[in-house]
Regions:
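Two-component histidine kinase transmitter core
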Residues: 39-40, 110
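Signal-transduction coiled-coil helices of two-component systems
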Residues: 23, 40-43, 242
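Small-residue-enriched core segments of transmembrane alpha-helices in multipass membrane transport
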Residues: 1-9
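Conserved E/DxxT/N motif and adjacent residues on the DHp alpha2 helix
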Residues: 35, 42, 155
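ABC-type nucleotide-binding domain
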Residues: 46, 52-271
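A general structural motif at alpha-helix termini
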Residues: 2-3, 37, 136, 154
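Cytosolic ends of transmembrane helices, especially the final helix of ABC transmembrane type-1 domains
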Residues: 8-36
Length: 271
């Protein structure tokens, strides 16, 4: 009987201790969340920034140098590249040479240390971030999908898109056939980070997003490097369709990905 009373008494205490531990962990996570939310981004609109409108897509890197703020090692040194509107350029070279950094400077994920990057003659630092990034589409190796439906994930490229626009983007990305074979079609849930889809299917959603956004400037950063040969063939057709009449910067190691580029630029380890 004594042991029974002890058990009855201890059980609520154990539950209370577990609740206190959960509360402490939750508070710690919430504090970290607030820190992230309240963090001011380093890259912001300058006073008097203007909107980028009526974009033709002429891109110029003028004597650009760059190093990260926490590292004095130079990543890029006096790089000059001119990409006429509607033309395509491929960047090739060893890993760590600065190819992705070059692409990241265009939408101002980072700012140049010296020199300037321009679109249609306008320094990207003089433009509002929203208008600048609205004119640039990106397809990367790693695709982030939300835990929602295929329809919702495609619409991320243009939140106010109509159902017809979403389906047209999917068709142009060569994914309409596999969607129509799914029981719920466009209302199929993709799972967290797209776990219910193959690598090729996830990449096609990423491409459909850009078709929907319809930007004049396109960045393809190792878009097919993680795919098998069969998936790459399907994706490559979609990418070629996507790049038509757009200023395109492609980073890739496979010849099949860059062979149609108007110009190939080799980036060395010294940037």
């Amino acid at each position: 009987m004594y042991a029974l009373y002890i058990g009855i008494f201890i059980s609520p205490i154990q539950i209370l201790v577990e609740l206190v531990e959960m509360l402490q962990k939750g508070l710690s996570g919430f504090r970290r969340y607030l820190e992230v939310v309240e963090t001011e981004p380093e890259i912001q609109d300058k006073e008097g920034a203007i909107d980028l409108e009526n974009v033709k897509g002429d891109v110029c890197y003028d004597n650009v140098s760059f190093h990260y703020s926490d590292d004095n090692k130079t990543v890029l040194s006096q790089v000059s590249i001119h990409i006429p509107a509607g033309k395509s350029v491929a960047l090739v070279g060893p890993s760590g040479g600065g190819k992705t950094t070059i692409c990241s400077l265009l939408p101002r994920f980072y700012d140049v240390t010296a020199g300037k990057v321009t679109i249609d003659g306008k320094d990207v630092r003089d433009l509002t971030l929203k208008s600048l990034r609205n004119q640039i589409g990106m397809v990367q190796q790693d695709v982030y999908l939300f835990d929602g439906t295929i329809r919702e994930n495609i619409a991320y490229g243009k939140p106010d898109a109509t159902d017809e626009e979403i389906k047209e983007a999917a068709r142009r990305a060569n994914m309409d056939d596999f969607i129509m074979q799914l029981p719920k079609q466009y209302d199929t849930y993709v799972g967290e980070k797209g776990t219910r889809l193959s690598g090729g299917q996830k990449q096609r959603i990423s491409i459909a997003r850009v078709f929907l956004k319809n930007p004049p400037i396109l960045i393809l950063d190792e878009a097919t490097s993680a795919l098998d040969n069969e998936s790459e063939r399907y994706i490559q057709k979609s990418l070629e369709e996507l790049a038509k009449n757009r200023t395109t910067i492609t980073i890739a190691h496979r010849l099949s990905t860059i062979k149609r580029s108007d110009e190939i630029i080799v980036i060395t380890e010294d940037g």
